[in-house]
Structures are given as C-alpha cells and as structure tokens.
C-alpha cells in the first residue's frame, strides 16, 4: 500500500498543496512550524478520522477557512500479483463532515478509516506506553479492525450494549431491567476479549525480535494482558452480576473489556513505570513496527509508515536501526525532520526529499 497523491486544502498553514511521494523512503524537511508535520497529519486524519494533535475543530482548519479538504490516491494489493488504485476524499468543518471513497459517498468515517491503513509515530506516541489504558485498547482494536473483517461489527455490538447498560445504571433502573443488556454485554465482551488476547499473543511473537533489533538495551521480553475483569476466576456474565449493585450505586459499568489493558515486560526493568521518556518512545515505536509487520503478514502488503520529527525523537543509532528495518521491507515511509537525519545519510537513491516552507511543499535534490 502506498500513496501516489495527497492533496491538502485549508489545513493549518496550507492553503493548497500537492504531495506525490515515492513508494519507498520519503523525507520532508523544513524549519519548526513550517508545516511538514501537517502533511503527515492530513494523512492521519484520513486514516483515523482525527488528528494526532487534537480535534479537527481545535486549530486544524486554516485561519479564515470554513473547512478543510483532503484527497488521497493510493495503490494497494488487489490479488496475488495485481494492484488497484483507490481514491478517498474528506471535507471537515470541525462540526460536520462529508466523505467519498472510490467515487461513492460514505455514511460513516469508519469506511474511510478501514480503506487506508497508516501507522503513525509522533512526539506524543510515548503515551501508548506511559499513558492510560485507552490508547492501548485503541492500539489492539486498530490491529484487529484492519485484519479481521468482522471485528468492527463485534466492537460496535459491545459498545452499544455498554452504552445502553450505562444509561440504565445512571437512571437508577431496577435490576431486572439490566438482564438483557448484561447478556448482550457478556456475550460480545467474551468474544471481543478472546480476539484481543489472540492478537496480543501473535503480536508478542513479532514484537520481541523487533525490539531486540532496534533497541536491544530495553530487554523487552513479553506482553501481559489484563482483560478488564477477573477472567481467570469468573465469566464476564458472573462478573457483571456480582458487580451489579456497586455499578448501580456508581452509575457505570465497572467490569468488562472496556477496562482492559496490556503492558510490556522487560528483563532488566521492573515495569513500564520505570521507563524514561526516551525508553517509552522506543518501546512504543517497537510496538508500532511490530503491528505494521503483523498487518503486512496478514494482508500481504505494508501499511503506510509515517514518522514525525524522527531526528529529535531518536538518537542517530536508534534512527539507523529503525530506518534499516523499514528500508528492508517493501513499505512506503514518510519521515519529517528539520534536516537530514544521520540515519538517512546512506539511503541513496531510495530516498526522495521534499522541503516545506511558506506553505509550499517542493521536491528537492540532495544538494539543495
């Protein structure tokens, strides 16, 4: 999977810009604040329905503009040896949005997100390891969403049951009114948890060698999973029943996969809380690379890899290891930096360079 064309209108500093990246390594340079991150941000919005720097209405739309527009054309695998071209467009005002995919209107942002797969590493990615459980649950669900066609329906089934149960709890509904939603929550939640656990076990097999290759000093050895209730002791149905009175008092559901979490284990460290910010970033990057490799194995093609501000996030040795691993894979990689990162100094003809300045994006040569 690789982007052939990215068109951006009225996004941050850009009034209108066209980007035609190579299918291999791409480097976007520019001063801080020039807008190079916004190129990756536009791609991320199309693939996730949100920016990695906040909501669309919080400064993403260019000052004076009413909305932003993003258009992406990409090539993806269509069979054993064939490719097809796909196109998607999104217009977003911060309050309302319209989207098109392959010439057809889409009713849900999920349709766009399911079509285009982008793995993003950016300065805030360390929260995947050092933050709360929500980004880690999203991480698992993204991987499942893109490799298991029926996962989204399962996730929505659980989310709907959870919303209905919580609404009844807040209303102080009688216990018997919870029975139907408890059954739905337990049935979908058990299946959701099994899928997550299977995915995490598969991911662990890829993560350990990835972490060893790019950051051997971490000693990352395994992943642990907390399903969101005492699954080894009781079923989710029983856990919901046992917690029912407490949930009625508190007004929310305290047991289930919406409270699940996972964590990395390290040979030489007591746990993720002992990690420095730099170590948390490296661990997060290893997890993202492992997820991308799993996607490639399951789908037969790599997702698009977007690495923002790589030079300031990793030292030259870790940069070199990461780039070497990505360059050895048939992945399209988009990297931003203020200048040529040392890890890319030997990339040669596989690297296409661009410069961002004054709201413009132009191809450059190594001598520029």
From Swiss-Prot:
Keywords: ATP-binding, Cytoplasm, DNA damage, DNA repair, DNA replication, DNA-binding, Nucleotide-binding, SOS response. ATP binds at residues 30-37. Pfam families: SMC_N. GO terms for biological process: DNA replication; DNA synthesis involved in DNA repair; double-strand break repair; SOS response. One of its GO terms (cellular component) is cytoplasm. It is found in: Cytoplasm. It comes from the Bacteria. Transmembrane segments: none annotated. PANTHER family: DNA REPLICATION AND REPAIR PROTEIN RECF. This is DNA replication and repair protein RecF.
């Amino acid at each position: 999977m690789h982007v052939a064309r990215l068109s951006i209108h009225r996004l941050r500093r850009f009034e209108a810009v066209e980007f035609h990246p190579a299918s291999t390594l791409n480097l976007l340079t520019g001063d801080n604040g020039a807008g190079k991150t916004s190129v990756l941000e536009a791609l991320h919005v199309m693939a996730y329905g949100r920016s990695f720097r906040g909501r669309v209405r919080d400064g993403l739309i260019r000052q004076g503009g009413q909305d932003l527009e993003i258009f992406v054309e990409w090539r993806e695998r269509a069979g054993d040896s064939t490719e097809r071209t796909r196109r998607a467009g999104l217009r977003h005002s911060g309050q309302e949005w319209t989207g098109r995919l392959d010439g057809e209107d889409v009713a849900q942002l999920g349709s766009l997100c399911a079509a285009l797969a982008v793995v993003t590493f950016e300065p805030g990615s360390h929260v995947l390891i050092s933050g709360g459980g929500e980004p880690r649950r999203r991480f698992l669900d993204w991987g499942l969403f893109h490799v298991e066609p029926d996962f989204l329906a399962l996730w929505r089934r659980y989310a709907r049951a959870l919303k209905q149960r919580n609404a009844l709890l807040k209303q102080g509904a009688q216990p018997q009114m919870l029975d139907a939603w408890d059954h739905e929550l337990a049935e979908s939640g058990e299946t959701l948890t099994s899928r997550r656990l299977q995915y995490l076990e598969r991911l662990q097999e890829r993560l350990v060698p990835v972490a060893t290759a790019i950051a051997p000093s971490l000693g990352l050895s395994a992943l642990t999973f907390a399903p969101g209730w005492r699954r080894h002791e009781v079923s989710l149905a029983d856990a919901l029943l046992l917690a029912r009175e407490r949930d009625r008092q508190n007004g929310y559901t305290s047991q289930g996969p919406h409270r699940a979490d996972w964590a990395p284990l390290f040979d030489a460290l007591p746990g993720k809380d002992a990690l420095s910010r730099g170590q948390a970033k490296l661990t997060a990057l290893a997890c993202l690379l492992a997820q991308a490799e799993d996607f490639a194995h399951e789908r037969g093609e790599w997702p698009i890899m977007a690495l923002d501000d790589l030079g300031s996030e990793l030292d030259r040795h870790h940069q070199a290891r990461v780039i070497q691993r990505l360059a050895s894979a048939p992945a399209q990689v988009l990297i931003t930096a203020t200048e040529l990162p040392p890890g890319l100094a030997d990339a040669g003809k596989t690297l296409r360079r661009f410069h961002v300045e004054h709201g413009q994006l132009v191809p450059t040569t190594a001598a520029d």
